[in-house]
């Protein structure tokens, strides 16, 4: 598919939502409906020295811009590709004497592009940045205060020789960033590393049970010949069959919240009241709050356990932030034990604890206990998420890897195969995560064949292999959730 080609969609007025996009042809699961390059994008302030400012990949060794000493790149190819967007920024940073925050940098990049190309539609865009929603009129007192600070800082940073924009227009751009900023992740999809504006994506409306997902692809510059390079882009991918004329939707937030909580988040962050079927009917809310059936606990017991779980999660967050991982495990075990006679395995409080416990225990290399919690977590997720949900796929992948580390080769292989099937739909076969998962799938398949042929020899060979190479340690647990689709200023 040509990036920027939009023949598969058209803009229409969606009832109760304003503008939206609908399909002009039929699509099936895993189809890429459109791909779009960022209009403008920047790396987060905290990662400017660790992430390429062109492709947003994490690298150990990056080349620094020799002039401003701020921008970092994988290599000369990425640096050359970045120059058009970095040229004005480079001069402005040198003159300003310091690096402004990511919001200021992104606003400036957008306006330098407007200065170069005008305010009309650019190639492949169905909407200009001028016509994107800003919701400035809905900002609360604190947001208005932050906006004034951002505008003042921007005016100090913006070069006097560049085109001068009105205060109203500058405020509009900051509003656009606030409402339409899309989170950019690293090449493994595990960490949010930046934020970008994708105008066409801004036309896709929300649904808590969507028919599409959005995936960030960092592109590939590794080939010797530039003709084989692929560009950094987002891809809108179908999660199942989509009929011609059907509205295209994505979920702006994680589904695993009560409908009332999702609606509250959406109202606060995106200024609209969600009227999707799952919110109107409270679908799956009963599972999110499910209690044991036999014997069924009283409402008072359930209420007390909810409060106890909330208090424990607060203690866990504090312990995690301080790196006290053994304390985290202790708190999880105690709370899960108390929840056992009260909550069912789809209860959100159970699932949150299972997720934390499996992640932290994997990091501590206590794989046997971690694998038990991971299996319970996946069983619960499978009853709640859409079968092709990207977050489900990532969770199943991690659970499969944990079970493989624990020596549960059959369970681990089964989970990795399941995760691979999901990620083929949500990420596509060429995404780095999917490629990693394919390598894992092939390895576990080979080991499973050996296991079935001679279980004793398999365990002897596995033990020898693990003794002769460093154990792969899971990433250190983070308090940060998995990267959300849309970026909100903290």
Curated annotation (Swiss-Prot):
SMART domains: SET
Coiled coil: none
Swiss-Prot/TrEMBL keywords: Cytoplasm, DNA-binding, Metal-binding, Methyltransferase, Nucleus, Repressor, S-adenosyl-L-methionine, Transcription, Transcription regulation, Transferase, Zinc, Zinc-finger
Listed InterPro entries: H3K4_H4K5_MeTrfase (IPR050869), SET_dom (IPR001214), SET_dom_sf (IPR046341), SMYD1_SET (IPR044418), TPR-like_helical_dom_sf (IPR011990), Znf_MYND (IPR002893)
GO molecular function: DNA binding; histone H3K4 trimethyltransferase activity; transcription corepressor activity; zinc ion binding
Binding site for S-adenosyl-L-methionine: 17-19, 135, 205-206, 270-272
Disulfide bonds: none
Gene Ontology biological process: chromatin remodeling; heart development; methylation; negative regulation of DNA-templated transcription; positive regulation of myoblast differentiation; positive regulation of myotube differentiation; skeletal muscle cell differentiation
KW Disulfide bond (keyword) present: no
Pfam families: SET, zf-MYND
One GO cellular component term noted in the UniProt record for this chain: nucleoplasm
Catalytic activity: L-lysyl(4)-[histone H3] + 3 S-adenosyl-L-methionine = N(6),N(6),N(6)-trimethyl-L-lysyl(4)-[histone H3] + 3 S-adenosyl-L-homocysteine + 3 H(+)
Residues reported to bind Zn(2+) 1: 52, 55, 74, 78
Zn finger limits (MYND-type): 52-90
Binding positions for Zn(2+) 2 per the UniProt entry: 65, 68, 86, 90
Organ and tissue specificity: Expressed in cardiac and skeletal muscle, lymphocytes and thymus.
Subunit structure: Interacts with HDAC1, HDAC2 and HDAC3. Interacts (via MYND-type zinc finger) with NACA isoform skNAC.
Domain remark in the UniProt entry: The SET domain is split between the S-sequence (residues 1-49) and the core SET domain (residues 181-258), however the two segments still come together to form a conserved SET domain fold.
Biological role stated in the UniProt entry: Methylates histone H3 at 'Lys-4' (H3K4me). Acts as a transcriptional repressor. Essential for cardiomyocyte differentiation and cardiac morphogenesis.
Designated name of the protein: Histone-lysine N-methyltransferase Smyd1
Taxonomic source organism: Mus musculus (Mouse)
Gene name of the record: Smyd1
